[in-house]
Amino acid sequence: MATPSLQLGSGNWAVKSDSLLGYKTIDSKYYPREMTFTRATTGTRVNAAGLVEIVPYNLFSYSEDFTNAAWFTTDVITVNTTTAPNGTLTADTLTIPSTTNAQYYLIRNSFFINVGQYTQSFYVKKNTYGYIALVSTINGSLQTSYFDINTGVVGTTTSGTTSSITDVGNGWYRVSQTANETTGANRVIGIYFANSLMNSINVSLSLTDSFYAWGAQLVEGTQPLTYLPTTDRLDIPRIDYSTGSSALLLETQRTNLALRSEDFNNGSWTKSGATVTSDSIVSPSGIQNADTITQSGGTLNINQTITISSVGNYTYTVYLKKGNFDSSTLFRFGAFQGGDLGYITFDFNTNTTSVISGTIISHSSTSLGNGWYRIQYTINIPAIGAVLFYNGGVGGSIGVGNFFYSWGAQLEVGPYPTSYIPTTSASVTRNADTCTKTGISSLIGQTEGTLYFQAKGLVDDSTYSLISLSDIGGANRISIGYANTATNLYFEYRVNSSYLINFNIGYIVKTDNNRIAVKYKLGEQAVFLNGVKIYSNTLSSAFTTALDRFSFDYNGGGFPYYGKVKALEIYTTSLTDAECIALTTL
């Protein structure tokens, strides 16, 4: 079989700060083909370890560009002066600017830190000076960790913080500091010159004193994690493992309207017959930031009142883990607006949800492992105004003294749940994902070709969801994907602005892991689904302008593809029927 001219996925994913790398293989070697990816916000994914994580998990932007305005410094910074730990000439020199006794630093100023534990880290190397400190004002007081980078030794550390230093070779060390934030506020975080006694960040040094720095990182949790370089942090593709294998996650724009999504002890949540112990257990993120909710008496209820600005379908989700109560105890989740709009129950014994009252549109539970479940229901909100969304035991009780664990509440407009969006004091929006590649006429067959993709849709609904090969204006185009009916594929073959083929075909469950291929050449077009040829035609019209772009939509004209894409392949030849059947067989 021919080799694809452009591939994505098939277990081989490479992500850059603002793009996704496709590839071509020649003699078992991979040659990158850079895709254009945009979202303009961060997002979350399920990583290879099965944990929910922020993408990117490095909370520092411009992690290797210390002259960027995101950083505030009193040092003299000379860029790209020495080889960094990754072998590139990208490490900077930080030099004392004055002999005056003072503090000299590279920091993030007024950097918002939510409640929880955080670890900052830098790669550092002695140039002419070898004493530095990591400093933060996490939790409202000065947290200082001193390091001797002449010999690789941790000095004194503020009580309540932990520090480490790791030799990474060639004189470089990775230094880290972990501190606990209990209130959530704007903080100072960064790296300072320290005195040689390692007991002060007020120093009087020579104008020639300097050290090298590279690779700043701030992450949630108590471990520094593998270094992840960043620029603006906004357009990083998400390779998701929620289905057990890797896939590119493409989602529509959604907003989490639930405030303090991980902090049920906050006043945004009203507690009845309940006490909350914050950050008491490891959450689905792998960080100790989930809460324990204990029934203290009366009726157990945790709720938040949210003002709804438009009527329609809303989806509520929350992560839940059983505590010490009898496993037969059911949990109740619902919405109230002048009366019960509807509620569901969740049974830990069977990992199932059930509708008890109201017009619940859909409901389900998903196991994340380690006893955690994500519970979801979709309900129609018939009027604007305040709606109370609640969690609690059926009958109002799980038993006084009994407890459960909770994390990650989310309310979003839409008929199905999307990936988790953390919030603090305000709602947060995750923008839609887009992925395109232009200027690739040489990679697309102009007189014949094949387009293949393997993907799993996010919802089985009546909405077009397409991928396309096209020219710049879309007058010549091949589109394939989900039709605007719940069970059909859509195939379009357009030449010189005329729709020569424009059909809903076949039968498909959009949320299944489907393999789809379309092949084309003069006198033959065909579509294959999961190992079966489901459509053929014999048109002989040639494209009037070159197809020069690929997009996960209708050539930029709407109908974006949202789902979990496991593979994409573009060929400059029309594969045989047997090859297409083999390619699409599950």
Predicted ranges, named:
Residues 1-5, 203, 218-246, 412-443, ...:
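Extended recognition patches within non-cytosolic domains
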Residues 56-63, 70-75, 100-102, 112-116, ...:
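Extracellular glycan-recognition modules
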Residues 66-67, 124, 208-224, 264, ...:
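Extracellular, beta-strand-rich glycan-interacting domains
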Residues 81-103, 280-301:
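Short carbohydrate-recognition loop motifs
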Residues 103-109, 143-147, 155-168, 300-306, ...:
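Short, aromatic/His-centered strand-loop micro-motif at the edge of beta-sheets
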Residues 126, 178-183, 322-324, 378-383, ...:
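Localized edge beta-strand/strand-to-loop motifs within extracellular or lumenal beta-rich domains
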Residues 173-177, 185-190, 373-377, 453, ...:
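Carbohydrate-binding surfaces in secreted/extracellular proteins
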Residues 188-211, 386-403, 537-564:
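Flexible glycan-contacting loops in extracellular carbohydrate-active proteins
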